[in-house]
Every structure is written in C-alpha cells, then in structure tokens.
C-alpha cells in the first residue's frame, strides 16, 4: 500500500503528518463471523416447542373406557338386541345396582322376546313390581308382541324402525343399535347429556328443545365410525362414574383438560336444573279387606292412570265410601280399623294414604271376578302390585 500524507496548518507553517497504511477492505463478509459471535441474539431465532396434538374426543373416551369402564354388567354378557333393550328400559330413571337383580330375574323368566310376548301382562308386571314407572313394563310387553307379529322376533337394525316400537325413543333406539349391532347411532341419555353439557358449557335444562337439539348435534358429531358399541358404553359409564351429578371426579376425567365448564368454574351449575314446580298433595283411603282365610282383596286398576293395570287395594276418598265397595263385591264389613298413614311420592304429586282394615264375612263373591282378586299375604299369586300395596302387605305379613 502506498503512504499517504495530510497537510495541516500549524502556526502558519505547513506540517506533513503521516497516516499509517491500512489494508484494503473489499467486503464486509470477513467481518461478520466476528460480529456474529459477539452478538448472537441479533441473528439467531428461537422456535417455540410444538405441543403434541391432543387426541380426538372419542379416542380419549375409549382409552379411559379400556382401563376404567364397566365390562361385567349382566347385559354385557352374551349381548343381543333383546338383552340390551330390556336393560335400557329398566335403566330409565333407575340406578344400575337396583336394576341388576330385576334384570336377572326377568331374563330367567323371559329369555327371549317370543317368551316375553307370550307371557300374560300380570306376570310381566309381577316381575316389574318395585321398579316403578310401570308404563315401561306395559310398553315393553306391547313392543315384544309387535316384534314377534311383524318382525318374526328379529330386531330391526335401523334407528327409525326401532324408535317406531312402543316405549322406544330416539336415544334408546340408538343404544340398542350401537351396543348390540355396532351401528353408528348416537345416544343422549341422562349421563351423556351431563358429560356433553359440561364439556361444551351448554347452559339450560337439557330437556328444553333448544338445549336438547344442540346436544343431539354434538352427540352425532362426536360419535365415531369405529368401536361404536364401546364408545356408547364408555360415554354412559363416564357420566355414571366420573362426571356425576354431584361431586364429579374431574381429577380422573379424560376430558378435563378442555372441559369448558371446569375451566370456567361452572361444573356445579351444569347441566341446568329443571324449573321447580310446587308438588301438590292428594289424599286417598285404601281399604284392606280381609276374608276368613286371611287373604286381602285387591282390585285391578284400569290401564291408564297411576298404577295402570296393577293390583291395588280398593280406593276411596274417605272411609264413608266403604258401602260402595261392599256393594261392588257383595261383602259385608264387620269391623274397621285405621292404620298409620303413609306418603307415596310420584314424579308430579305426593299421595297421602290412609289404610283402613276391614274384616268381611266369609260369604262373599265379586260381581266382576276378572277385576277382583283374593290375594294371599305370602305372595304366592304372581301379579303386579302397586308399590304402597307391596309395602303394606309386607308390614301385615310381619305382624
């Protein structure tokens, strides 16, 4: 490199000052490595770590079911549409633990839909005594007759055909199709409603049309194409054992991470409760008429109304109605005694019952024998009994 000079003025004289030669710089590239090593943050980018994708809703439910679901319920052994149907009807409004012994007895007496169809209504109701909601049993019996008469005892495989049978709604039809045939059919029973309402933070009572329709849309969308039977059972189990009405166990729920109700602290308020109504109270007198053999007189109730087609004690508004009863069955009452009253609660009213015992003379015969029955307290006659009748008979047998 050549030397360079610079002339500066100093006290009127010219002075030559030397400038040291510098190497020629043709590019900035050689400088960058040193610059970069000095300040790496200016050119290095941080890439956020990707979180693993959350498994789909149905996969989480099925994974939980495989480990924690219920796999040994009676209707899960030797699965058939008939067994699933009977269990689903019994489980409406009734806990699993209560249903199991009734289901076992029912299957022992009516192992096929044909045998159920051929049974008498009284015998079917006898097997239902104590489960309540007796319209379920009457509808079950009627639907069995239809299945035998119109389908040759073979269950249809479509939800629409199943739902056309008496006493089978959309959700029950879906459960029969899904659980016994693995057909892609969503369900929406009480347990599933609770799980979906909480997971999606859907406010309102689930039986409101708007809310119910929304839940059906979600249930339909989430039901998978594979393992439908397992998924259906899993959703019911999840609602029954984890996402319970009170004290839900969110800490073990496979859906907790994205459950909107949990994240918004709304678990206790979802699903919404049914609007409260004042439950009225009605009063009645039940006449417990004994004959000399110690049997009690029962009357078969009409098919519609409370205790439809069940046997009950003759009923009246007050004890003064006894003459009407004695005229109907041609008995003569000799003594009356009032027992301790009891209350029976229906879904829509309370019934306060005053039992009155009546001792009758031995010469008695009913004018309508198909309507009246002398019932032994040992229960050896198999007919359906109203719940308060069963309770009173048990107390009478114990005395």
Predicted regions and their residues:
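N-terminal low-complexity, intrinsically disordered patches enriched in charged
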Residues: 14, 21-22, 139, 318, ...
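Intrinsically disordered, low-complexity, charged terminal extensions of DNA damage-control enzymes
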Residues: 35, 42-71, 76-77, 237-399
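Catalytic cores of DNA base-excision repair glycosylases
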Residues: 55-251, 255-266
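Intrinsically disordered, low-complexity proline-rich regions
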Residues: 20, 24, 32-36, 40-43
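Low-acidity, Ser/Thr- and Arg-rich intrinsically disordered low-complexity segments
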Residues: 1-5, 10-14, 24-27
């Amino acid at each position: 490199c050549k030397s360079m000079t610079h002339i500066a003025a100093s006290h009127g004289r010219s002075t030559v000052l030397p400038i040291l030669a510098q190497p020629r710089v043709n590019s900035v590239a050689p400088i960058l490595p040193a610059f970069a090593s000095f300040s790496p943050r200016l050119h290095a980018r941080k890439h956020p770590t990707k979180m693993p994708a959350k498994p789909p809703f149905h996969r989480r439910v099925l994974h939980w079911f495989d480990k924690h679901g219920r796999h040994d319920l009676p209707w899960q052994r030797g699965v058939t549409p008939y067994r699933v149907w009977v269990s689903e009807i019994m489980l409406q409004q009734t806990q699993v633990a209560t249903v199991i012994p009734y289901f076992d007895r029912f299957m022992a007496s009516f192992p096929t839909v044909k045998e159920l169809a051929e049974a008498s209504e009284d015998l079917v109701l006898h097997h239902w005594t104590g489960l309540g909601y007796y319209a379920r049993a009457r509808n079950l019996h009627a639907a069995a007759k239809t299945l035998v008469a119109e389908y040759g005892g073979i269950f249809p495989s479509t939800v629409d055909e199943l739902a056309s049978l008496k006493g089978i709604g959309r959700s029950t039809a879906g459960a029969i199709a899904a659980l016994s045939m693995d057909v892609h059919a969503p369900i929406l029973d009480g347990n599933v409603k609770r799980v979906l309402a909480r997971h999606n933070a859907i406010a309102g009572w689930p039986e409101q049309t708007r809310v119910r329709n929304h839940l059906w849309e979600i249930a339909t969308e989430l039901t998978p194409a594979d393992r439908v039977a397992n998924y259906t059972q899993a959703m019911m189990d999840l609602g029954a054992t984890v996402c319970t009405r009170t004290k839900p166990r969110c800490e073990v729920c496979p859906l907790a991470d994205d459950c909107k109700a949990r994240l918004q602290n709304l678990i206790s308020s979802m699903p919404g409760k049914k609007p409260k109504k004042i439950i009225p109270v009605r009063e009645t007198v039940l006449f417990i008429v004994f004959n000399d053999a110690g049997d009690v007189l029962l009357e078969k109730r009409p098919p519609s109304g409370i205790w439809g087609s069940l046997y009950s004690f003759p009923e009246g508004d007050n004890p003064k109605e006894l003459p009407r009863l004695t005229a109907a069955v041609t008995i003569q009452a000799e003594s009356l005694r009032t027992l301790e009253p009891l209350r029976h609660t229906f879904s829509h009213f309370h019934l306060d019952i005053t039992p009155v015992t009546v001792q009758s003379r031995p010469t008695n015969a009913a004018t309508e024998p198909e309507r009246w029955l002398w019932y032994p307290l040992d229960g050896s006659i198999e007919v359906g009994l109203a719940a308060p009748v069963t309770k009173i008979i048990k107390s009478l047998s114990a005395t």
